[in-house]
């Protein structure tokens, strides 16, 4: 199944380009990079300079770039939970 705007919640986010649109720590707003790890509550982002930043999903609004170059904005609370649990839900 391809990544689309409608089914991104069920896909693995690791490997997608990301930009932080809103976040309580204003120094992180605008940060761009690649999602290199995901847990139930966090995303680990590697910036273009190689810096790694872990952010809480629930606190932010993120823009993901899908493999087809489409940009999707998602509130972090929509992607809370372990990635494997989100993937299991699509099978049910």
Curated annotation (Swiss-Prot):
The keyword 4Fe-4S does not apply. Its main location: cytoplasm. Its EC number is 3.1.26.5. One of its GO terms (cellular component) is ribonuclease P complex. Gene3D superfamilies: Ribonuclease P/MRP, subunit p29 (2.30.30.210). It catalyses: Endonucleolytic cleavage of RNA, removing 5'-extranucleotides from tRNA precursor. One of its GO terms (molecular function) is RNA binding. Transmembrane segments: none annotated. InterPro entries: RNase_P/MRP_Rpp29_sf, RNP1, Rof/RNase_P-like, Rpp29/RNP1. It is found in: Cytoplasm. It holds the Pfam family RNase_P-MRP_p29. GO terms for biological process: tRNA 5'-leader removal. The keyword Lipid metabolism does not apply. SMART domains: POP4. It is an enzyme of class 3 (hydrolase). Keywords: Cytoplasm, Endonuclease, Hydrolase, Nuclease, tRNA processing. Consists of a catalytic RNA component and at least 4-5 protein subunits. Belongs to the eukaryotic/archaeal RNase P protein component 1 family. HAMAP family: RNase_P_1. Part of ribonuclease P, a protein complex that generates mature tRNA molecules by cleaving their 5'-ends. This is Ribonuclease P protein component 1. It comes from Staphylothermus marinus (strain ATCC 43588 / DSM 3639 / JCM 9404 / F1). The lineage of its organism: Archaea, Thermoproteota, Thermoprotei, Desulfurococcales, Desulfurococcaceae.
């Amino acid at each position: 199944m391809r990544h689309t705007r409608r089914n991104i919640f069920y896909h693995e986010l690791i490997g997608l380009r990301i930009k932080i649109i809103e976040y309580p720590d204003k120094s992180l707003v605008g940060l761009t990079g690649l999602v290199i790890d995901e847990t139930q509550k966090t995303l680990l982002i590697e910036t273009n300079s190689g810096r790694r930043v872990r952010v809480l999903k629930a606190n932010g609004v993120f823009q993901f770039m899908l493999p087809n170059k489409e940009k999707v904005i998602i509130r972090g609370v929509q992607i809370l939970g372990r990635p494997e649990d989100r993937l299991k839900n699509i099978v049910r």
